[in-house]
Amino acid sequence: MATDPSPARNRRETLVFHVSDVHFGLEDTDAIAWVKREIAEKRPDAVAITGDLTMRARHREFEAATRWIRSLDVPITVEVGNHDLPYFNLIERFFTPYKRFKGVESVVEKELDLPGLAIVPLKTAVRAQPRFNWSKGWITDAALTKCLDAIDALPEGVKALVAVHHPLREVGTKGTALTHGGQKALTALAQRPVLGVLSGHVHDPFDLTQETVHGPVRMIGAGTLSQRVRSTPPSFNELRWDGETLTVRARNLGDVRTRDMQIDDVPEDAMPPRQPGEPVAPVNQVPRADPPVH
């Protein structure tokens, strides 16, 4: 499967690299070195990292993530993923959950203002939830209000890309929803100048539309740069905004075309698809064994 041809950079374009789920501790070293080279060569206007910098929020994992982020030398915003909250230290998880981001705290949940475009954060990873599976997303009223206020404050004519970790898809009942409050958030975003919602979490790229009572919202998911692949090789998204059209390419080391990289629905988690009906990318690089988790 041949890769998409790389278009020449239009000076009037805004170029954004959408990276997710690097999972330092189980990172793919070839993939992160390649992305670093791509950033140095193409000099994107911004890099949006949509969560799960680490595997288990260990100090050494954050130290490696900090070194990598600092080496990129471009405007960056980082969303917090469920894997980035302290896993073993519950006191720290509840009282100082972002403590281990020291060194890159200035870019955590940071709004980036670009020519005609803003990247606005929306927090979906929380310390605790009234359900057993805390790895899933939960949007609080305060987090949604903060995001909407930021979008409403943008200058007239400026579009927004909303950066989250969990896709804003509610699957099943409230107890099993991938992101509790996701549909409410999408409905509110549909009433605003939002180009799309950038997410991670599920380790496969996608470019889908979710309907709401106020119209459709584009949902753009990035793959992973870790060893924990689902059905596609490690990848990131290259976004180009020319003032009218937002194009998305799923860049990858496997030279696979974007359309062969993207799944056609949002799965409930990042585990490789083993059951009938689970979304699988056309390239179908499902690992024979489940990836490591530690």
Pin down the residues of each PLM region:
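A short C-terminal boundary segment appended to hydrolase-like catalytic domains
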Residues: 1, 241-294
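N-terminal active-site segment of His-dependent metallophosphoesterases
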Residues: 1-71, 87-88
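Active-site neighborhood of phospho(di)ester-bond hydrolases with catalytic His/Asp-centered motifs
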Residues: 18-20, 47-52, 76-82, 123, ...
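Active-site environment of divalent metal-dependent phosphoester hydrolases
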Residues: 25-27, 55-60, 82-90, 126-132, ...
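Charged helix-capping and loop-helix junction motifs
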Residues: 32-33, 61-65, 139-142, 176-185
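Extended active-site neighborhood of metal-dependent phosphoesterases/phosphodiesterases
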Residues: 63-146, 154, 188-190, 213-215, ...
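Short acidic, glycine-rich surface-loop motifs adjacent to enzyme active sites
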Residues: 151-171
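Conserved beta-sheet core of the metallophosphoesterase superfamily
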Residues: 174-244
